Structure formats: C-alpha cells, structure tokens
Design a protein with these regions (language model features):
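Hydrophobic alpha-helical segments and their helix-loop boundaries in membrane
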Residues: 1-147
Length: 147
C-alpha cells in the first residue's frame, strides 16, 4: 500500500468519489480509476516483458503507451514483478547456501556424518539474518525495486 498510495488516492479522487457523487458515468469512472494504475504498471514493467506480451497478443504494434491494451499490460507487469522477486530471493539464498556448505564441510571433516547439517546451520542463518538487519534490508530492497 505504501508504494501504491499516490495512485490509489488519484483513482479515488478522479474516479470513485465523482462516480459516487453522480458527477460521471460508470464507464468514465472506470477509465479514471484504471488510468493511474496503468501509469504505475508502465513505470514498473520492463520493456522486454511488455514487448513479449505485445508480440504474444498478435495485436498491431502499439504507437505509444495509450495503445497498449490493459490485458497485455497486466501480465507483463506481473512477469516483471516476479522477475524482481526471484532476483531478491536469489540474493537472499546465496549467503544461506554458503553457510550450509561451510557447516556441512566442517561436520564432514570432523567425522560427524550422522548429524544433519541443518541442525547446526539454521541457528547461524537466523543469527546472520538478525545481525545484518535482514527485515530492513528486505523491505528496503522491495521498495527500491519500484522506480
């Protein structure tokens, strides 16, 4: 909600409230609500993802953003966000897998083959996450992923 607040406010101000007051038609209200959302999605969608879905839709090549269908924009936006989520997830995964490898190799070198490495590495992973202020870094990277 933090990222979308200006867009939701604009949709409420230009679409919902005028419609509830009877000043505009339902079609105009829907257009006024969708416009800020489209603007947000265009700003966040990678050009390559948008091009992929434009090509898959077999629609004529759009001249500008207003020519791109909302039904084409939404999946492109979702794919862009999923790509960002996977990148963030991978960056979190790397230090954890390093801890797993260090703990597993240490246990093997000590001859403790029957002790599951997860029992030892999990507290180290939690400790690392807490010491580097993981929640702060995670939320910051999520917010910074929005340009």
């Amino acid at each position: 909600f933090y990222i979308m607040a200006p867009y939701w406010g604009q949709a409420n101000e230009n679409g919902i409230q005028p419609y509830l007051a009877g000043q505009i038609s339902q079609e105009q209200a829907l257009e006024n609500i969708v416009d800020p959302m489209r603007e947000f999605m265009f700003r966040q969608t990678r050009e390559s993802d948008l091009a992929l879905f434009v090509n898959l839709s077999e629609a004529p090549r759009p001249e500008g953003p207003e020519d791109v269908s909302t039904f084409t924009l939404i999946p492109a936006f979702i794919i862009s966000e999923l790509k960002t989520a996977f990148q963030i997830g991978f960056m979190i995964y790397i230090p954890f897998i390093v801890i797993d490898m260090i703990v597993a190799s240490t246990l093997m070198s000590m001859g403790m083959m029957m002790l599951p490495p997860v029992m030892i590495s999990l507290p180290f992973k939690i400790l690392l996450f807490v010491m580097v202020d993981g929640w702060h870094l995670l939320i910051q990277s999520l917010i910074m992923s929005f340009r």
